[in-house]
Amino acid sequence: MTMTNDPVVIMKQEVGKAAASRVKSDSIVGLGTGSTTAYAIEYIGERLKSGDLKNIVGVTTSFQAEVLARKYGIPLTTLDVIDRIDVAIDGADEVDPNKNLIKGGGAAHTQEKIVDSLAEVFIVVVDSNKLVDKLGSTFLLPVEVIPKAVTPVMRQLEQLGGKPELRMGVRKAGPVVTDQGNLVIDVKFEGIDDPATLEKTINNIPGVLENGLFVGVTDIVLVGEIIDGKPSVREIC
């Protein structure tokens, strides 16, 4: 891994390494999206190169993850040709005490949900500031929507008590476009009391492909922290 003196970067590296160390030979691995997950992908590649890990294939959740996996020499497959995923590693934008998540800051939550929900073991890697008492406390809820349905979907999200905004690109003109060619609406809720019900309700709105609530799918959360100036990793099961 890249050498650095930045304790935050070192902490993310340690969390990624802790997750990657749980990958076993002869397995199919879901490879998620995000800065911490990127270190897990890198370390899986290092284990393959050293011979510590053998005969694995990855299933990626985004174009970003695919690029990283290929960079680090991880063989890839697709959901069309496999019937299981042994372990998936992914990040999150918020994690509540029940290990429910908000994901989608990278606009990849639809593919992430497909891969993560199929995994026998789903490991979430985060830093401690992603832990919240209630989902929606600090992060907007992403909703992927087909382009023609943006306006009616936004109206229905408002009726649910949300404040929706179309996500715009940072280094491009116009809105963010997902890997599926759709748009993303970010919705502010003043705390989500019942994430399971809200997840289903939003997904039943015509024009919505998927939203960023992940309910009841997480097995393990690996949390990176800086204690007394030093990085550490703790596990929530």
UniProtKB/Swiss-Prot annotation:
Its GO biological process terms?
D-ribose metabolic process; pentose-phosphate shunt, non-oxidative branch
List the HAMAP family hit by this protein, alphabetically. Answer: Rib_5P_isom_A (MF_00170)
**Signal peptide start and end residues:** none
Q: Which NCBIfam families match?
A: PRK00702.1, rpiA
Is Transport among the key words of this record? Answer: no
CDD domains given in the database record: RPI_A
So where does substrate get bound?
33-36, 90-93, 103-106, 130
Give the protein name, as stated in the record.
Answer: Ribose-5-phosphate isomerase A
Assembly mode: Homodimer.
Query: Key word Cell membrane present in the record?
Result: no
Enzyme nomenclature, EC number: 5.3.1.6
Q: In which pathway does it act?
A: Carbohydrate degradation; pentose phosphate pathway; D-ribose 5-phosphate from D-ribulose 5-phosphate (non-oxidative stage): step 1/1
Where does it sit, as one GO cellular component term? cytosol
What is the documented function of this protein?
A: Catalyzes the reversible conversion of ribose-5-phosphate to ribulose 5-phosphate.
Reaction(s) catalysed (UniProt annotation): aldehydo-D-ribose 5-phosphate = D-ribulose 5-phosphate
User: What InterPro entries does the entry give?
Assistant: NagB/RpiA_transferase-like, Ribose5P_isomerase_typA_subgr, Ribose5P_isomerase_type_A
- GO: which molecular function terms? ribose-5-phosphate isomerase activity
Which UniProt key words apply to this protein?
Answer: Isomerase
Q: Which family does it belong to?
A: Belongs to the ribose 5-phosphate isomerase family.
Active site (record annotation) = 112 (proton acceptor)
